[in-house]
């Protein structure tokens, strides 16, 4: 699953009709600069995914897209690490939470930036060993930040400090 039109086209996959939700355990979170550790229970490939993180600022339930920005405290960088082979192992029963929920698989930071009125002007860039590996404008997202906050808030209550990785 991905949340960008250009990447969907590049990979030759269908545009999703709705976003994929999954919850990460608090033990997966680490701060910027901490080391992502491959678990002993997994011997496959570990991949990075640079993503925009939306930080919720106040309790949020059933808000519209227009109201969503009033519930966003700010934005952060997110490295949504994945044990990719766990998802691919059985396509009929993908292990999303396990593949993304290992200890240290949720890196955020180094800070939270508030006061961004139009997140569509942001660009997600991932640089690994001085090489740019990802470069996607938020405006190319299938489900943009305000839409994601609205959609998720209609399914579950969002609390202050919750982080939505945008995919």
Annotate the PLM regions:
Residues 13-15, 21, 43-48, 65-70, ...:
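Solvent-exposed alpha-helices and their adjacent loops that cap or buttress functional pockets
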Residues 1-50:
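Extended, compositionally biased flexible segments
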Residues 16-18, 25, 48-52, 71-75, ...:
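A generic structural signal for short beta-strands and their flanking turns/coil linkers
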Residues 21, 28, 53-55, 107-111, ...:
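Conserved hydrophobic/aromatic beta-strand scaffold that supports enzyme active sites
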Residues 3-4, 26-29, 51, 58-62, ...:
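Short acidic/polar capping segments at secondary-structure boundaries
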Residues 33-68, 73, 77-82:
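Non-heme Fe(II) oxygenase catalytic core, chiefly the N-lobe of the double-stranded beta-helix
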Residues 7, 37, 84-167:
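Catalytic-pocket segment enriched in acidic/His residues
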Residues 1, 54, 80, 108, ...:
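A residue-level signal for conserved active-site and pocket-lining positions in enzyme catalytic cores
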């Amino acid at each position: 699953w991905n949340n960008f039109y250009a990447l969907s086209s590049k990979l030759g996959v269908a545009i999703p009709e709705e976003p994929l939700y999954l919850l990460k355990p608090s033990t997966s979170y680490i701060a910027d600069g901490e080391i992502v550790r491959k678990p002993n229970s997994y011997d496959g490939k570990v991949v990075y995914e640079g993503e925009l993180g939306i930080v919720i600022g106040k309790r949020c339930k059933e808000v519209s897209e227009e109201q969503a920005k009033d519930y966003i405290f700010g934005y952060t960088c997110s490295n949504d690490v994945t044990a990719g082979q766990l998802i691919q192992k059985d396509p009929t029963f993908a292990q999303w939470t396990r593949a993304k929920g290992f200890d240290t698989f949720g890196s955020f930071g180094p800070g939270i930036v508030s006061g961004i009125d139009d997140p569509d002007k942001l660009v997600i860039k991932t640089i690994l060993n001085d090489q740019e590996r990802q470069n996607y404008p938020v405006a190319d997202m299938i489900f943009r930040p305000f839409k994601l906050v609205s959609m998720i808030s209609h399914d579950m209550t969002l609390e202050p400090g919750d982080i939505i990785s945008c995919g």
